[in-house]
Amino acid sequence: MPRLTCPILASATALLAGAAAHAQGDLALDRALEPAPAKQDRYLVKLPQRELVEGSPAPRTGRLILFFLRDDPRTADREPMDGPFFERLQPIASVSLEGVADDLLVVDDRTAAVFGGPLDLFEGAWRVQAVLDQDFTASGFRGPGNRASEPIAIDRAPDAAEETVLELTRTFAAAQPPAHPKIEWLERRSALLSAHFRREVVMRAGIVRPFGYDDLSFPRRMWPTVYVVPGFGGTREMAVQQADGLASRSARDAVPQAVWVFLDSETPWGHHGFCDSETNGPVGRALVEEFIPFLEERMRLVAKPEARLVTGHSSGGWTAIHLALAYPDTFGACFASAPDPVDFTAFQRTDLYRDKSFFTGKDGGETPSYRGILGPSDDRVFMTVRDEMATEQALDPDGRSGQQWDAWEAKWSPFDPARNAPRPICDPETGDIDLVVAEEWTRHDIARRVERDGGRTARLVAERVRLLCGTRDSFYLNEAVARLKAKVEAWQARERAAPGFIKLVEGHDHGSITPLARIRFHQEMLAHLRAHGLADPAPSTTPAETGLPGAEPVSPPVRDARPAEQPRERAQGL
């Protein structure tokens, strides 16, 4: 691959016209306009020795990534590699290891793909950390066998060329879920996925049984199932956060008494959304045709659509809706909060059908991607789409960053054999939308299907989908939800009322909507199960009267004062 230093710096430079109002903070991207200084700062990373193959050193693969973070008390408890930090964008640089023979790798502005540079212009106190990413079995750069350095404190002078040496002293171990008395960790080989990838592929889940499941004298023997799809970056280990509450005797009247299945939705490309694609393989079919039947053979589960519920937040929310619509004979009800775009005329702030670029709007201003609430009607834009894509490019220009846009491309774009990666939705330098790829994406536009498939999708949404989203969603996902809501309600006005709903909750953002959604969805799940004879009758007292979990008041939206680590991962249990 060609080096991408210049295109990425050009992307950052082009941000200047609209970035002044965004208070970009540490990056000071406007300095990218200054002429290159005479000094040349370098970072030297000692690479591990290569294994011998038939007497010769094996070729190197993967990327070396440098993460930078201002040495600031507000981020003292974070390591640079804990990013990207969406509320305090950080410089990132990376170098491909392809063709590298030396054991000492030089990283500077001339060799690296850089976001937030040039590196030569850094001044003052920073911390830098190196990561060697040679694994492609897990999302992101923390896969088994990958290595990292300790964070190194540096103090850059404006007029002195300096070198920093980093040693890769840490090794990431393969992820192992923690032992928990109320969780069973299950794995099952997928024949469909193994055939697609021509290697062994397993599907995984964390299982939480309800109170009474293992009691032979308990009156209920067969149980409904709630399938939980984690949000972006989440895994089946989300079960650990929820197990004690879900299996508690005291929660029986407030929490659906079901077997809760926490799925894994991560691939090397990012969140696959159980959406079949050339890149991710038949992940949806594997879930429905292999994994769910396996669970229903192994456990005492009611094998009927009305007994299978699916829920999720953010990317997990989009996935829950997708599964309910794609497999109506499997899932009988869906509960989704703050889903990824459900109407591509509002793909965050971009109309995929009419706009030319993801980076700029019709007025020429920068398109925002992530915001925070400042007041009743005021937001602060922390990150633009240009920022976000440039960050992903700096992590891996070949589409393997594991971040959000690369994950969307893996789900919805055609696979490009020449690139050995999904085809990008837009030009990484200009943001210009690739119309061929966009046409492929439209097959996954839920609102478009509501309008165009003769009422089938509209009926399913109206009958089976319960959707909540804050009006101040951090990623502007409320705009797509509002448009889908209008289209479904227009269909309902012509046809009939149904138990599903789409509601926008005033004042809540991407994170603060989750406790409200949890309370509301638990109540809705209980009502659904009772309506189908799958739950005990409602108690004579409400959760608020009994003090059971789920009765806690919903707090007003608040913002974390420190930088957010991967805000898209705020996938709370529903």
Where are these regions (language model features)?
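Bacterial N-terminal signal peptides
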Residues: 7-18
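Hydrophobic, helix-prone linear segments
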Residues: 26-30, 36
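Contiguous beta-strand segments within globular domains
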Residues: 34-65, 204-206
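Non-catalytic cap/lid and distal C-terminal segments of serine-dependent acyl enzymes
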Residues: 69-559, 573-574
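Cationic, low-complexity basic patches in intrinsically disordered or flexible, solvent-exposed regions
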Residues: 566-570
